[in-house]
Amino acid sequence: MSNIFTKPRGTQDMLYDKARSYNKIVDILNSVATNYGASPIQIPMYEESRLFKRGVGNSTDIVMKETFDLANKGDHDYSLRPEFTAGIMRAIIENKLYASPDLPLKLYYSGSIFRYERPQQGRYREPHQWGIEFTDLNLDDSTVAEAILVMVDGLKALGIDPIIKLNNLGGDISRSNYRKALVDYFTPLKDKLCTDCQKRLELNPLRILDCKVPEDHELVLKAPLLKDYLIDEDKKKFAKLLELLDSCNVKYTLDDKLVRGLDYYLSLIHISEPTRL
């Protein structure tokens, strides 16, 4: 065994120019968020494990496979944060930030997250994340559009020309209708699904749409579309958001199969992809 210590698998040392570039990127994004009236927030690198199970979802890959759980001598189980949102919501509630007269809350953050997944090119067990949370008891369309604009302007400030992918997940009624349709569709095909998706069929069938197994992907292509199960109220709300984005000249595409592996996504989901770098 070598006497020379090396960095843990799936981590990296940021040296010199790379560290400077990282700091510059964070500074640029912080500046854009500040221009939109957002404030910084810092939260612990670890939280009670049950926070992530409740906030992120028991059936998600993050909770089932990817959390770094900490050995400790106390009565509580702790995990390194696999993402920021659950911890930020905990901080908002614990510190009663929801009682602020200045709503919606606009918060930005950056730092390490930790996911125990297979390291590969461009994927680490300790990636770094920058993000924003715009939070209110009742988020209106203009606030949601503004949050998307922060992302768009931030990427443009970094020299990236993004296009936004959007999907309307609807409200409770729409998702309940769609969940039943997915169960009806996938149940006869259960034996053809991977082991994980067989569990997802029982816990959260929407997560099957995010499966990366090629054989499951073929089944997903023929699955019912969520847009066919949206009630009129959800359709009108989404249409209003698209009007706001159009008025701001935001480039976007609609993706009926776009879902994400976190259970706290409601109503709308969006990701950005570069059209050029």
Regions found by a protein language model. Give the residues of each.
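TRNA-recognition modules of translation machinery and tRNA-sensing kinases, especially anticodon-binding
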Residues: 1-273
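N-terminal low-complexity segments that are often proline-rich with Ser/Thr-Pro
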Residues: 275-277
